[in-house]
Regions:
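Non-catalytic, C-terminal membrane-associated alpha-helical segments of glycosyltransferases
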Residues: 34, 49-127
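Short, exposed beta-strand "edge-strand" segments with a Pro/Gly-rich flavor and a Y/T-containing core
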Residues: 17-23, 68-73
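Cytosolic juxtamembrane regions of integral membrane proteins
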Residues: 41-48
Length: 127
């Protein structure tokens, strides 16, 4: 939105940055909701047209992650930890992302409800 309004992006090497790999697992649902809401607004991209597609997409992604994890030179407990993390993170990605991607199809009342209860951007604007 800011770029569309004519603002410019600049790089500042001294600016504090909070990278996504530093987020808590509990914040990803809201992050993906906001991200895919924006991806639809800009590119009309939706990861899934219907929620019934999500189990297949989720299983495929978690399987791929687990195949990668199995190849890593780490202990069995650590592999299990990362496999569980993958399951939860990908659940957040697919459900939060699909909710956000379908945002344009919801009534105004539902949009407000979802923004109020999920969106990180909504909370940041209200702060």
């Amino acid at each position: 939105k800011m770029i569309e309004l004519g603002y410019k992006k600049v790089y500042c090497p001294f600016a504090p940055v909070y990278h996504s790999h530093n987020f808590k697992l509990s914040t990803y649902f809201a992050r993906y909701y906001d991200e895919y809401k924006g991806l639809y607004e800009i590119h009309q991209y939706m990861m899934a047209q219907h929620f019934r597609q999500l189990p297949r997409l989720w299983v495929r992604q978690v399987r791929g992650d687990c195949a990668y994890i199995r190849q890593q030179p780490i202990g069995k407990k650590t592999k299990i930890k990362w496999a569980i993390y993958s399951a939860f993170r990908n659940f957040d990605r697919f459900v939060g992302g699909t909710l956000g991607g379908k945002y344009h199809t919801y009534s105004e009342a539902k949009q407000k409800f979802l923004d109020k209860h999920i969106s990180q951007q909504y909370r940041q604007r209200k702060a």
